[in-house]
Amino acid sequence: MLRTEWIARRHGHANVSQMYYARQGLITEEVAYVAHRENLEPELVRSEVARGRLIIPANTNHPNLEPMGIGIATRCKVNANIGASPNASNLGEEVAKLELAVKYGADTVMDLSTGGGDLDAIRSAIIQASPVPIGTVPMYQALEAVHGNVEKLTPEHILDVIEKHAKQGVDYMTIHAGILIEHLPLTQGRLTGIVSRGGGILARWMLAHHKQNPLYTHFDEIINIFKKYDVSFSLGDSLRPGCQHDASDAAQFAELKTLGELTRRAWTHDVQVMVEGPGHVPMHQIEMNVRKQMQECSEAPFYVLGPLVTDIAPGYDHITSAIGAALAGWYGTAMLCYVTPKEHLGLPNAEDVRTGLIAYKIAAHAADIARGRPGARDRDDELSRARYNFDWNRQFELSLDPERAREYHDETLPADIYKSAEFCSMCGPKFCPMQTKIDSQALSELEAALKPQPVAAQE
């Protein structure tokens, strides 16, 4: 496996995180690999990891991982969520979703399974099959361990599950440590309250016990687990807005301030961190949200869900959210969490995964172009040349979804002869504007014809 020898050389180290080695001035094999993938200098990647602006989620128990970077210096990344529920799916279906997500360009995948069989077996199968980083939300399995009875949850239950996930090879975990008991009254004026599953569990626990969030009070113990396996924090935004009305409110920003404090606490132990963000945010507030996160969290990579820019399109929320995601990426968000057409409606199937992922690959790519990332537009230019030259097969190859592009073309013109035709079914053979080729000789003749003629002298 790719990383087996790299990992073996670190055996016995108390801290095996990429941040720890980067702060020692070392360029690890993972750093070099990411630098090559991103066409960046290895020293730049190392310095960004050391600073905390870039993370490389790479658990030492995930040896078949192909390392990738998440940060402002790298391409804008896309995460795909999969996972079985008590009402739908199973291990085989989730592994198939993983393979589909990787095929269509997911940079990371989160297993959000809450049921549907043996959660440990599902997670293990996904990690073993995955070349991309895998994330989880350990609170879900912690709740299952007490049969859904939130009041019976203990810090020990939660820490045991976190360590189990780390030992299995999970590369990053959503840890909802930022929601504090004093934040709960701030949700009173909301339309949709708390919409984070993990945050909702912890809110109910705090209300039942009148005690502080156990993930907050035991944060240093989680740090100690993470540095043993190089697990990255994905600090969860439990109080993210669940609708336009609730965006950018006091509850959201109170938690964000705490997430910044936790980020810096993890950094003191050389543990990698990214910070999760909203959610549902109107377009005119997205830039402010990104800037505020950078300020509060000392430029730790920002990882946002959408955001959805309107709430009135169930069944089309891959579109409402991709609009917000493109803007968030442009303003500096490091990773976008995809949303599928099934959002708010049901568990996504394989086709939903494909549709949501392609929408988000478009958003991330558009953000890279807008950010002026070197080489970001190269593929666009190459596809445009193929389009202008009626090289249909090359157009399909360069598409984000080659199968869908070919399928749509072939609905009306399936015969092979039309793969070299200088038209498609939209314009037909007589009206395609790209048949108009203006060469240099034609331009020279045109310029000569338009050149003012000398006026004859009058006698």
Swiss-Prot record:
GO biological process, one term: thiamine biosynthetic process
Positions of substrate binding: N81, M110, Y140, H176, S196, R197, G198, D237, S238, L239, R240, E276, Y303
InterPro entries with a match to the protein in the record: ThiC, ThiC/Bza_core_dom, ThiC/BzaA/B
Cofactor(s), names only, from the UniProt record: [4Fe-4S] cluster
Catalysis performed (reactions): 5-amino-1-(5-phospho-beta-D-ribosyl)imidazole + S-adenosyl-L-methionine = 4-amino-2-methyl-5-(phosphooxymethyl)pyrimidine + CO + 5'-deoxyadenosine + formate + L-methionine + 3 H(+)
GO molecular function: 4 iron, 4 sulfur cluster binding; carbon-carbon lyase activity; zinc ion binding
Residue numbers binding Zn(2+): H280, H344
Family to which this protein belongs: Belongs to the ThiC family.
Xref: PANTHER family: PHOSPHOMETHYLPYRIMIDINE SYNTHASE, CHLOROPLASTIC (PTHR30557:SF1), THIAMINE BIOSYNTHESIS PROTEIN THIC (PTHR30557)
Name listed for the protein in its UniProt record: Phosphomethylpyrimidine synthase
